[in-house]
Amino acid sequence: MEIDSATNGNSDTVMTESAATITPSPVVVSSSRSNQFTESLKLEHQLLRVPFEHYKKTIRTNHRSFEKEVSTIVNGVGELADSDWSKDDTVSRLTCLVTRLQGLKRKLEEGSNVENLQAQRCRARIDHLDSVDVENITEWNNTKLKRILVDYMLRMSYFETATKLSESSNIMDLVDIDIFREAKKVIDALKNREVASALTWCADNKTRLKKSKSKFEFQLRLQEFIELVRVDTAESYKKAIQYARKHLASWGTTHMKELQHVLATLAFKSTTECSKYKVLFELRQWDVLVDQFKQEFCKLYGMTMEPLLNIYLQAGLSALKTPYGLEEGCTKEDPLSQENFRKLALPLPFSKQHHSKLVCYISKELMDTENPPQVLPNGYVYSTKALKEMAEKNGGKITCPRTGLVCNYTELVKAYIS
């Protein structure tokens, strides 16, 4: 790490470590392919979970559609067999059933194609993880980095940029653009105070949401009820009561207290000053629904709430965070000199360093017993190698790059690291 000036500025003083920038130790790549694969799986849960969940959803949707159509057609054939219709009516109805069968065949083919594409995506991701090896670790990590960047872009709604990067890098099967587009439509609708898209999403994922004991749909229904009450007309109150009977009554067995709280708004106006009910009419409730949807969406697909880029950056910053990195005098080489990195590192503990690692401000090389630190008269510290090279080029003169102080090489004092 770099050393700032000593507090008293004397040449015989051993320097402080206040201007520290920690140099991370090099990562040692294990030669065991199985160990690498196992460790990768721990970090790549959502890479496999997302397409697999989408694949299961498509299969269930196609199966339900198939059963519904077949049931209708079989019932139609049964009615024809038991009826005494004329020949023309029978032929006409049979023609309609044949048309429905042809339509069913087309839907099955389309559904099969979609299933095959999603199965291909699952296989591509398994193959990607299985390809981890010492020989291609650099290329594999490069692909992983692009996946992480695409994940960040998608979460920030940069869909066009994410698509272009994915296509140019040939990683379309390794990213989830369509899933995030689906989520973006729901989020935009909620921001526009519309719940239809969110309710459709809940219906499409009803089984899984019920299994996870989600109450997101209940919250959406409550918000629709509140919006009807907000209108504050006799007709809107009537609609609100009808809506509650149709869509909220079934939630009473599990969420009675919340339901009673919201239903009590029938006795209040949206302009009420009663804090208990005023909060229900606040527009920020829509922001709460957006946040709740994001949580349910990530939970459904096994995604992290934070972008993967943030998580990996925090993992690195946890090894670099020092008290000096948060000071104004922090050198620009320290990542924590950047405000965005400081925000990411804020909840992280300081790095525990048992031994100091000093990095020369001039050469950026490590200072150790082979290249010991030297203290200038002004208290600033640099490596012996860098100072020797400077002295050779300037007739034995040393110029401090941070203060401009000029001194002779003979005035330097060797520092010792404890």
Swiss-Prot record:
The keyword Ligase does not apply. The keyword ATP-binding does not apply. Keywords: Cytoplasm, Metal-binding, Zinc, Zinc-finger. One of its GO terms (biological process) is proteasome-mediated ubiquitin-dependent protein catabolic process. Its main location: cytoplasm. One of its GO terms (cellular component) is cytoplasm. It is found in: Cytoplasm. A zinc finger (RING-Gid-type) spans 330-403. Residues 179-236 form the CTLH domain. Residues 141-173 form the LisH domain. It holds the Pfam family zf-RING_UBOX. GO terms for molecular function: ubiquitin protein ligase activity; zinc ion binding. Interacts with RANBPM. PANTHER family: E3 UBIQUITIN-PROTEIN TRANSFERASE MAEA, MACROPHAGE ERYTHROBLAST ATTACHER-RELATED. This is Protein MAEA homolog.
